[in-house]
Amino acid sequence: MVRARVRLSGVRGSYSAVALADTGARMTLVDRSLAERVSVEYTGRALSFVSVSGHPVEALEAVVPELEVEGEALRYEAVAVAEIPEVVKRVLRESGLDENVVLGLLTLERASMVSDAAAGTLRRVEAFIL
């Protein structure tokens, strides 16, 4: 498992944690209760996806004013907000990871980071555009 230090700064508050960096997840997922607590800005777009467990998940797209990943600050990051199932939260907790945030590939790419599974961390890389 790859871990990353994150800090979400919303309109009304912020939240710091060590989260799972999941390259199998397209978007960063934020639990609804945390999104409400820090006050994210909803875009009005509904999202549907299938979780790793095979269950359908309904989410809302939102924008976090600032999402910091391993010290790299990303302004106005789009995230998926949903109720993370308790079974998933339990697995994350048992792995020593935060249960409210799962980093997705789009966030990692925007931060110019790749997953280093051998080290269990993220690594900065040079960004380039083709």
Residue ranges and their predicted role:
Residues 1-130:
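Pepsin/retropepsin-fold aspartyl endopeptidases
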